[in-house]
Amino acid sequence: MRKGLIFDVDGVIIDVSHSYHYAIKNTAERFLRRDLDIELVREIKFKKGINNDYLATLEVIKTFGGSASLEEVIEIFNQEYEKLKEMERLILSRDFFKKLRDLKVPLGVLTGRPRQDLKDAFDRFELWEFFDVVVDDDTIEQPSLRKPNPYALNFCMERMNLDYAVYVGDSLADYQMVEGFKRQYTKRVDYIHFGDRVLPPSVKVVRSEEELFQALKEALQNQEEV
């Protein structure tokens, strides 16, 4: 059995609480012409399980009685994010990924980040060397099949030639993608939830790099016993 580990980026590898989250807030404020509480913005994104931040911004605007087109939101959002991206920090260290590489299993990324944003971040934090396969929001041509569609997870596993994977995510959308995958595909996938901004039911939750490393080791070892 070929086993591997697949990671979300935002909220798992990289802290985007001062970049993407504020880009949503600032963009919505420009359309609504009013100030918004950042925690209310986060609540809308996470509790509604919205993976795409452009769509999360539209939902915030709609929630507060405004309107905008997706094209307008994308243009303003990208301007706001460009001003904030240097605020990002690593959550999982390079040493963490070096330790994972010592486990001799392939590592992958499945993210909703646009390709250029991902490239900028991975260049900045020097992360490319750790991953065998990277699937970003531009990898899959048809938008409806991109993350969080379970097809995207299967696509990533196929590229990595895996029979079993652990997906590490931080959102309701991540959890729902894995649950959808289990209903549609025969390959085995386990989900580990990183952080506690939102807590899906009956899943393994870890809150630190150390806890995550141990949980990943245990998941891989458990497959050896199956």
Question: Can you say where each PLM-predicted feature lies in the sequence?
Answer:
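N-terminal helical cap/lid subdomain that shapes the substrate entry/recognition surface
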Residues: 3-9, 13-96
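Core-facing hydrophobic residues within beta-strands of well-ordered domains
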Residues: 2, 131, 188-189
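Short, acidic loop-to-helix structural element flanking the phosphoryl-transfer center
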Residues: 6, 82-109, 113-119, 150
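Substrate-recognition "cap/lid" segment bordering the active-site pocket of phosphatases
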Residues: 108, 114-166, 172-183
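Structural recognition of alpha->loop->beta junctions
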Residues: 127-139, 198-218
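Short, hydrophobic alpha-helical segments
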Residues: 160-164, 216-224
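Acidic, Mg2+-coordinating phosphoryl-transfer loop and its flanking beta/alpha structural elements
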Residues: 167-207
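Short beta->alpha linker loops
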Residues: 19, 95, 113-114, 148, ...
